Amino acid sequence: MKTVELTNGSKKKVEDRIVGRHVYGNLYGVDPAKLWDEEGLKELVREAAEVANMKLVEVRSWKFTGYHGGVSVMALVLESHITIHTWPDYEYATVDVYTCGERSDPWRAFELIVERLEPEDYVVHYSDRSSPKRPLGGTAGRIQ
């Protein structure tokens, strides 16, 4: 634990580590019209950020036309990001929700996206990306 000073001048004890939660998955059998709908996907990541208690900074998108084209949407949130990448020709999308902090809920954001895109099937993964206390010395995880 360490003590930090807040912007209002008060002090608070906090755990000295970063909390990182990463929910990501693949969606199969999604209606291609939904996967081509750039504006709809942008609105979806906005809503996902809201229900997950994330503070939205900006939403950007890119549409790639032609065979194997698709849409990529990225929401930059104060806590990290939400992305959706689509391949309408394959009725396929990937979804990535990563948050730093304990107040936001990446699961809720992921679930909303799945509910709205209505895939025939999906696979979801979770990774705890929180930082442990930093080890002293040693070379574990370092490239020499």
From Swiss-Prot:
The active site is at S80 (schiff-base intermediate with substrate), H85 (proton acceptor), C100 (proton donor). Transmembrane segments: none annotated. Its EC number is 4.1.1.19. Pathway: Amine and polyamine biosynthesis; agmatine biosynthesis; agmatine from L-arginine: step 1/1. It is an enzyme of class 4 (lyase). GO terms for biological process: arginine catabolic process; polyamine biosynthetic process. GO terms for molecular function: arginine decarboxylase activity. The keyword Lyase applies. It catalyses: L-arginine + H(+) = agmatine + CO2. Is synthesized initially as an inactive proenzyme. Formation of the active enzyme involves a self-maturation process in which the active site pyruvoyl group is generated from an internal serine residue via an autocatalytic post-translational modification. Two non-identical subunits are generated from the proenzyme in this reaction, and the pyruvate is formed at the N-terminus of the alpha chain, which is derived from the carboxyl end of the proenzyme. InterPro entries: AdoMetDC_fam_prok, ArgDC, S-AdoMet_deCO2ase_core, S-AdoMet_deCOase_pro-enz. Specifically catalyzes the decarboxylation of L-arginine to agmatine. Has no S-adenosylmethionine decarboxylase (AdoMetDC) activity. Heterooctamer of four alpha and four beta chains arranged as a tetramer of alpha/beta heterodimers. Belongs to the prokaryotic AdoMetDC family. Type 1 subfamily. This is Arginine decarboxylase proenzyme.
